[in-house]
């Protein structure tokens, strides 16, 4: 139980940063309200989507926004990827997994905020996952 964060599960109390990022994350005083607004906006935008590709683009855009808010002291990346998985299930679109060996590339895409490149990569990942799903 070494190195446990005493703030686990709560909004950050101290400023944090993403190594290699070219932007600042939200301040501790902004984190909770920005996260609340993020959730409300995400749900609204998902309701407006007309097809699975629009839903996926919205999920990816919202993921970039979440990572920029960076509301927790630790675990924002894992939490953000888990939220994307949850949203895929919620919206009944094929989920995808970002493998360990792809994390550096994924991080560079996030830094660039290039949702089109992320979208193309995720479409490939979805095809792979769909093949695995179809085996069952």
Predicted features and spans:
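FIC/Doc superfamily catalytic core
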Residues: 1-136
């Amino acid at each position: 139980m070494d190195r446990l964060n005493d703030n686990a599960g709560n909004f950050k109390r101290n400023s944090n940063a993403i190594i290699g990022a070219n932007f600042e994350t939200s301040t501790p005083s902004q984190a909770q309200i920005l996260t609340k607004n993020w959730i409300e906006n995400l749900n609204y935008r998902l309701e407006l989507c007309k097809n699975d590709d629009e839903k996926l683009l919205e999920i990816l855009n919202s993921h970039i926004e979440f990572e920029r808010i960076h509301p927790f002291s630790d675990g924002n990346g894992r939490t953000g990827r888990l939220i994307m998985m949850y949203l895929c299930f919620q919206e009944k679109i094929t989920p995808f997994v970002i493998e360990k060996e792809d994390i550096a590339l994924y991080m560079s895409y996030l830094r660039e905020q290039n949702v089109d490149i992320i979208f193309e990569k995720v479409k490939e990942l979805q095809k792979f996952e769909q093949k695995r799903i179809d085996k069952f």
